């Protein structure tokens, strides 16, 4: 095993990129270091940066497709090898970059036979296609394929809502706006005794719509913007123009609050742990999010059998989740959910003392 060496600052806090590469048009990698840091600071920064990289950076996706010739999402069209559902899934995977604000329209209008790829998307000049070779459909006959598209810039993810009215031929598409595919941090300590310092290593993978260095800059700026209000003096006598922004709070006594907290503390704790804190691989994370599993509480309300019913979920994914639950929370997920959450939470609480 070759031991890696990096040159770091010993006095002034500095960051630098120690590795950068483009594995493909849709996969960029970058590794960065920040040093010197006092004990504990690297973990604080690493956790905050990972969450900002995954959740605070905006991306551009196709969020809707429209064609009057499509009877329903799971139909097949004469002369096209793929089903409508497969075409929608291919559109979902198209990587875009833009400085778009809100939404805009785009379209595909092509005559077969031939392959339909991302380069056939007609979009405004401020929307750029990262990889023109991404496959959309295969036309086996001389037919016309015309699809209207809606492109949106946002952050996080957008789960499509069921649409029972297909008369307009419009179909929503799940969107994962996050341009950062994954982010990890690790810490290296050096020095002796009270002189110990830390180096933060930050690894970033992006989808090609921006570089890891650009992602790091955007995430840092977004974090700074979130903390700026705390730098201003608190306005004690705040006058609102009207009452529409005031929120009445229930008059709980301290005793009532304490009793309620004791009664529900395990459930509250589980609700407060979001699955993006568990360092899940992006594919597993996105599958869980699409199934409305956002917190550890949501996850524990499912059995291993339930997880296997999730679309695109594999037995390896369940094993990865079991490993993370055991490693970080000392919790096991039952193969079948035979007891309700309250009993499960109570048993977890009893085991933890």
Swiss-Prot record:
In plastids the minimal PEP RNA polymerase catalytic core is composed of four subunits: alpha, beta, beta', and beta''. When a (nuclear-encoded) sigma factor is associated with the core the holoenzyme is formed, which can initiate transcription. One of its GO terms (biological process) is DNA-templated transcription. SMART domains: RPOLD. It comes from the Eukaryota. Belongs to the RNA polymerase alpha chain family. Residues 266-353 are annotated as: Alpha C-terminal domain (alpha-CTD). The N-terminal domain is essential for RNAP assembly and basal transcription, whereas the C-terminal domain is involved in interaction with transcriptional regulators and with upstream promoter elements. Keywords: Chloroplast, DNA-directed RNA polymerase, Nucleotidyltransferase, Plastid, Transcription, Transferase. It comes from Panax ginseng. DNA-dependent RNA polymerase catalyzes the transcription of DNA into RNA using the four ribonucleoside triphosphates as substrates. Gene3D superfamilies: 5' to 3' exonuclease, C-terminal subdomain, DNA-directed RNA polymerase, insert domain, RNA polymerase, RBP11-like subunit. It is an enzyme of class 2 (transferase). The keyword Transferase applies. HAMAP family: RNApol_bact_RpoA. This is DNA-directed RNA polymerase subunit alpha. GO terms for cellular component: chloroplast; DNA-directed RNA polymerase complex; mitochondrion. The keyword Manganese does not apply. It catalyses: RNA(n) + a ribonucleoside 5'-triphosphate = RNA(n+1) + diphosphate.
């Amino acid at each position: 095993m070759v031991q890696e060496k990096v040159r770091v600052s010993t006095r002034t806090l500095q960051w630098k990129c120690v590795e950068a590469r483009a594995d493909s048009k849709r996969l960029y990698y970058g590794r960065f270091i920040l040093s010197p840091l006092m004990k504990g600071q690297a973990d604080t920064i690493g956790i905050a940066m990972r969450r900002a990289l995954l959740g605070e950076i905006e991306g551009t996706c196709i969020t809707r497709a429209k064609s009057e010739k499509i009877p329903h999402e799971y139909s097949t069209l004469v002369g096209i090898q793929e089903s409508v559902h497969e075409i929608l899934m291919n559109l979902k995977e198209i990587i875009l970059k833009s400085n778009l604000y809100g939404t805009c329209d785009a379209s595909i209008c092509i005559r077969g036979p031939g392959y339909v790829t991302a380069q056939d998307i007609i979009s405004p000049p401020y929307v750029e296609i990262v990889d023109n070779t991404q496959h959309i459909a295969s036309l086996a006959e001389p037919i016309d394929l015309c699809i209207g598209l809606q492109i949106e810039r946002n952050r996080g993810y957008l789960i499509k809502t069921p649409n029972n009215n297909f008369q307009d031929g419009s179909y929503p598409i799940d969107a994962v706006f996050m341009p950062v595919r994954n982010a990890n941090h690790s810490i290296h300590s050096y020095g002796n005794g009270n002189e110990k310092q830390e180096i933060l290593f930050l690894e970033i993978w992006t989808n090609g719509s921006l570089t890891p260095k650009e992602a790091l800059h955007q995430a840092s700026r977004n974090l700074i913007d979130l903390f700026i209000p705390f730098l201003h003096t608190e306005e004690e006598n705040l006058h609102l123009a009207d009452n529409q922004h005031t929120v009445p709070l229930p008059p709980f006594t301290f005793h009532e609050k304490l009793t309620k907290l004791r009664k529900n503390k395990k459930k509250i704790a589980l609700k407060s742990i979001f699955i993006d804190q568990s360092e899940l691989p992006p594919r597993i994370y996105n599958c869980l999010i699409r199934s409305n599993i956002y917190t550890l509480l949501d996850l524990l309300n499912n059995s291993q059998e339930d997880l296997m019913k999730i679309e695109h979920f594999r037995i390896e994914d369940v094993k990865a989740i079991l490993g993370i639950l055991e490693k970080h929370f000392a919790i096991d997920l039952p193969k079948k959910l035979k007891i309700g959450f309250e009993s499960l939470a109570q048993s977890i609480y009893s085991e933890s003392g």
